[in-house]
């Protein structure tokens, strides 16, 4: 849902003619920092895995952890019982080149199979901003550490790629690094700039491992989110997972 949601917001931006950068001004991708070095997660990190997705979902961030103006968004598959987008849209023309880069921003559980439980939370804010979190809990910390590594391996191969949205419109993607205070047992940060028809969205992303659980927090908007605000959300997300009773 996350990638298709970004594409939908880009379409809305085009319709409303609200570009994040005026003609002649540098786009957000021109200021992307390089990805940081690979971070190794401890395979023996302490922490029992979640085995119930409902319990894991309850440990994700909620409106109280976000800036004022955000509200929950129902997941069409989990909350509304609708079929996956790939099944619902027979005329879907979306594609990614290279194909492996379609994994960028995909839920952790999709990027590394074998999770004992997985969950997602979605929120929408003002001016086309969104915040979402997904988490996957694995049987062992070693499994979680491998998932954390897999995400970084994909990112390293996908610093620049392209594709099309569901309507066949060209989309360009650029990935760069972002700094942030360490969170959990291991963490990384990066930015993804998605551009189509001259309009761009910036996704600030934090991926963290705590115990046997890996979580991904994404804040998307026409401009990068305030660093302090994102740091607070990241540590709130990791803290809730670390302190929640797994079951």
Indicate residue ranges for each PLM-predicted region.
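C-terminal motif of bacterial Sec signal peptides marking the signal peptidase cleavage site
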Residues: 14-17
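N-terminal export and membrane-targeting signals
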Residues: 1-10
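A small/polar (G/S/T-enriched), proline-flanked helix-loop surface module common
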Residues: 73, 77-194, 245-246
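Extracytoplasmic/secreted envelope proteins and their assembly/folding machinery
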Residues: 53, 57-63, 67, 132-135, ...
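Flexible helix-coil linker/hinge segments at domain or subdomain boundaries
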Residues: 239-247
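A short, solvent-exposed beta-edge/loop patch
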Residues: 127-129, 171-235, 240
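N-terminal "mature-domain start" segment
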Residues: 19, 24-118
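Second-shell loop/turn segments in exported
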Residues: 50-52, 131-139, 220-224
């Amino acid at each position: 849902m996350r990638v298709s949601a970004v594409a939908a917001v880009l379409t809305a931006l085009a319709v409303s003619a609200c570009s994040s950068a005026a003609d002649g001004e540098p786009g957000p991708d021109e200021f992307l920092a390089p990805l940081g070095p690979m971070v190794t997660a401890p395979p023996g990190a302490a922490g029992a895995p979640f085995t119930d997705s409902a319990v894991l979902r309850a440990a994700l961030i909620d409106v109280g952890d976000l800036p004022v103006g955000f509200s929950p968004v129902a997941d069409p598959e989990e909350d509304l019982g609708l079929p996956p987008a790939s099944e619902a849209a027979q005329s879907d023309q979306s594609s990614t080149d290279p194909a492996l880069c379609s994994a960028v921003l995909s839920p952790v559980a999709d990027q590394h199979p074998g999770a004992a439980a997985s969950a997602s939370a979605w929120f929408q804010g003002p001016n086309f901003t969104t915040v979402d979190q997904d988490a996957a809990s694995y049987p062992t910390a070693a499994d979680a550490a491998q998932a954390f590594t897999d995400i970084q391996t994909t990112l390293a191969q996908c610093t620049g790629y392209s594709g099309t949205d569901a309507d066949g419109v060209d989309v360009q993607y650029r990935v760069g690094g972002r700094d942030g205070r360490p969170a959990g047992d291991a963490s990384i940060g990066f930015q993804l700039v998605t551009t189509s028809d001259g309009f761009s969205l910036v996704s600030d992303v934090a991926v963290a491992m705590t115990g046997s659980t890996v979580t991904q927090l994404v804040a998307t908007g026409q401009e990068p989110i305030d660093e302090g605000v994102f740091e607070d959300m990241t540590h709130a997300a990791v803290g809730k997972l670390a302190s929640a009773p797994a079951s």
